[in-house]
């Protein structure tokens, strides 16, 4: 019989936190008691889990010794302050922020796509959930990488506003309403108007001209694959879509791979659905395929006419589910099933 765990959700009132609750319930995760946590501003609110209304508790006052596992998605500053406290109290943390992703002794995990040595969850009691855009790309590319190797990845992302949070969703909806009614758009969340627009600017700009979001895809892909030789060249774009991230990916492979062989590899890959029938204009989109689902959807699979070892893909996923909450819960399932009973955490 599986062990039922006491679980805390840090950031339970946010977009990802709410989806944590949904995914835990859908996947019937074995929970004894669940504690929704947020800042003091959210105390007094309730969340629904398994037909029960649960009071949101103040994170600052919570005793993490009550729980076995904590899922964090409340921003990097919150994770930096409270994740070590949770571990010190004997709790294991799955963190959805970028706070710990680049530390050598903290695993960065996409279940099924990470190397075997990146599955040592016991080093510091913290497991990092990768960036949403990295997750969906790595899930789709891992079968190809295993088969023929990958030398270079060129990727352009088309990322929905839900990746920024609830305020960004509200701003997009408000801007559309204002503009359609002849009023100027009120710009607060993004540096420029997002409605009817595309912004090649996600996170801060780095000294090399790339954004932090783009560099996340470089660092994280290499860490997950444990292959620093992979060259990754991203351009991250925010688009006026509420849910679902899309990516145009162009690969330089170490050996040639036909489009048919790539489809066959991907069709067998866990967590991947191929949608690629051009005669029926069938290719994946955020609205039709990704939103509300946990798979990564791949289409427009074709050999690159400009390179003998080139392959092009279109990759779509729900950024709040597989790109965040579902991936974290899948990590939690591995912990619960394989590791949690034998963790030896630092004191």
Swiss-Prot record:
Its EC number is 1.2.1.11. Coiled coil: none annotated. NADP(+) binds at residues 13-16, 41-42, 162-163, 319. Pathway: Amino-acid biosynthesis; L-lysine biosynthesis via DAP pathway; (S)-tetrahydrodipicolinate from L-aspartate: step 2/4; Amino-acid biosynthesis; L-methionine biosynthesis via de novo pathway; L-homoserine from L-aspartate: step 2/3; Amino-acid biosynthesis; L-threonine biosynthesis; L-threonine from L-aspartate: step 2/5. Keywords: Amino-acid biosynthesis, Diaminopimelate biosynthesis, Lysine biosynthesis, Methionine biosynthesis, NADP, Oxidoreductase, Threonine biosynthesis. Disulfide bonds: none annotated. GO terms for molecular function: aspartate-semialdehyde dehydrogenase activity; NAD binding; NADP binding; protein dimerization activity. It comes from the Bacteria. It catalyses: L-aspartate 4-semialdehyde + phosphate + NADP(+) = 4-phospho-L-aspartate + NADPH + H(+). The active site is at 132 (acyl-thioester intermediate), 245 (proton acceptor). Homodimer. Belongs to the aspartate-semialdehyde dehydrogenase family. NCBIfam families: asd_B, PRK05671.1, PRK08040.1, PRK14874.1. PANTHER family: ASPARTATE-SEMIALDEHYDE DEHYDROGENASE, DEHYDROGENASE, PUTATIVE-RELATED. HAMAP family: ASADH. Catalyzes the NADPH-dependent formation of L-aspartate-semialdehyde (L-ASA) by the reductive dephosphorylation of L-aspartyl-4-phosphate. This is Aspartate-semialdehyde dehydrogenase. It comes from Legionella pneumophila. The lineage of its organism: Bacteria, Pseudomonadati, Pseudomonadota, Gammaproteobacteria, Legionellales. The gene is asd.
């Amino acid at each position: 019989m599986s062990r039922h765990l006491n679980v805390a959700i840090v950031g339970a009132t946010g977009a990802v936190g709410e989806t944590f609750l949904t995914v835990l319930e859908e996947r019937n995760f074995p929970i004894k008691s669940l504690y929704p946590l947020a800042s003091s501003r959210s105390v007094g609110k309730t969340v629904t889990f398994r037909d029960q209304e649960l009071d949101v508790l103040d994170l600052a006052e919570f005793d993490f010794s009550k729980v076995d596992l904590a899922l964090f998605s409340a921003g990097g500053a919150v994770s930096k302050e409270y994740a070590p406290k949770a571990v010190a109290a004997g709790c294991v943390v799955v963190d959805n922020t970028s706070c710990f992703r680049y530390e050598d002794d903290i695993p960065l995990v996409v279940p099924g796509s990470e190397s075997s040595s990146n599955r040592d969850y016991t080093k510091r009691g913290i497991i990092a959930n990768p960036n949403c855009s990295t997750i969906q790309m790595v899930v789709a590319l891992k079968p190809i990488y295993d088969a023929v190797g990958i030398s270079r990845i060129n990727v352009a992302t088309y990322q929905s506003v839900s990746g920024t949070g609830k305020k960004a969703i509200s701003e997009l909806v408000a801007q559309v309403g204002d503009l359609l009614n002849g009023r100027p758009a009120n710009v607060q969340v993004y540096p420029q108007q997002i409605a009817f627009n595309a912004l090649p600017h996600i996170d801060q700009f780095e000294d090399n001209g790339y954004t932090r979001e783009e560099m996340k895809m470089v660092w994280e892909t290499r860490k997950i694959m444990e292959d620093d030789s992979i060259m990754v060249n991203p351009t991250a774009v925010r688009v006026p879509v509420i849910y679902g991230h899309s990516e145009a990916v162009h690969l330089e492979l170490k050996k040639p791979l036909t489009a048919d062989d790539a489809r066959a590899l991907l069709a067998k890959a866990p967590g991947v659905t191929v949608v690629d029938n051009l005669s029926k204009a069938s290719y994946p989109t955020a609205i039709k395929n990704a939103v509300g689902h946990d798979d990564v959807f791949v289409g427009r699979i074709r050999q690159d006419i400009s390179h003998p070892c080139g392959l092009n893909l279109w990759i779509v996923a729900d950024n709040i589910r597989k790109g965040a909450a579902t991936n974290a819960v899948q990590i939690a399932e591995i912990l619960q099933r394989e590791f949690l009973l034998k963790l030896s955490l630092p004191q």
